[in-house]
Amino acid sequence: KRGFTMYVWLALVITLAIVIGAKVFVGKWPVLRQRFGIQSPTEYLKTRFGQPAQLTIAISGVIMKLLDIAAKWAAIGILLHGFTGIPVWAGVVVSGLVSMIYITIGGLWADLVTDFVQFIVQLGAGIVIAVGVGTALSERGLSYLTMWGELNTIQPGFSNPFNGDYTMLWCVLYLFAKTFEYNGGNWNLAARFISTANASEARKAAVLSATMYLLWPLLIFAPMWAARLLFPNLADPASELYPLLTQTYVPTGMVGLVLAAMFAATMGMTVSDINTLSAVTQRDIAPAFSARFRSMIEQPRTSLRIARVITVCFTVITIVIGLNANSFGGVLSLVISWFGAMVGVTGVPLLLGLFRTFRHTDGRVTIGSVVCGFLAFALTKLLPDFPSDWEVATPLIVCAAVFILGGLVNRALGRDVRTDADALLTTLAEPDRVDVLTP
């Protein structure tokens, strides 16, 4: 619908967000595992801010991630409908059930393998589609570089970096939100960084991810931009265009592989999310309410069984939400207006809590910052004329302001920093000089 701006606000913004994180944030995540033995992203918050703040962030984050995962089910339902003609609701249910079985049995390792294999298949298919569309353009005397003039005649502004609601201000504010999300505010990404060997390896992973975000979307988006010229009369381009490109330019036997890869890509994201939700619930939320549960998770077999039950329950909930995605404004609204706006509210204390600079921000201030962030989010939804540029970033800005100002007030009042929290922050201050504990 909007053209080149999609690459700017999605690919370029996220690339910059991850580059910033590679320098500032991600090196601290493996240190938490090496030095303090944490496994879930919110586990360290108990030492840093106390259990009430940890629970507030963990429970809030679980609710948000359920919306994000549901949006992914809805998205794959739309794709399956475009490829096969099955109803969208059936695609959501089938995707959810297959993924539930897969992640329950295979865990995070199965997710990593799926991610790698689906990328290889998608890379091959993406190249085939790009070459096929490029050939079709050349038959019209055009190329990917020269097609923009004709595209702009069909829809003025199609080649603009900022188009419609996606203004320069919107992109700058979105960068602010994505910097927190893609460097640990989104828990499944924090889990990936936690699982790297050390701070240096975490940074390398971030740089590789940023590079792929810069290059890979061009291979996917360029044929779809060009397809506005090749297939100008589609009734519903959002659901018809990519399946039509695949069926037109990819050899018949490979179409099934592309569909499988798209399915696996969605499954790779969702199972990673659900795996992390299960870890947070099992290690950080449930033990706070039950001494019996705390003792149960110390037993490996029992712990695994509990994790699988939690995984199944969460998957069912997200399928139900995915079936009702239109109630939230559709897939894009779920991803941007709901999850994208709220993830920073829990991401601010999760990431800024890693830095000694903010050591005077305590648990009470942290809970207050999260509450204020969610109130700001509610305000953006309740006010009918709230500026679209500020919708995503406002909750995060409010949360960050309360978090930082509250810490400054504590410092001015001379309130002490907890000894265990201060020791944690001192260790994190130099992530490359950590003595690695033997597992």
Identify what each model region corresponds to.
Residues 5, 67-79, 103-109, 223, ...:
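Transmembrane helix-loop junctions in multi-pass membrane proteins
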Residues 364-376:
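Central hydrophobic cores of alpha-helical transmembrane segments
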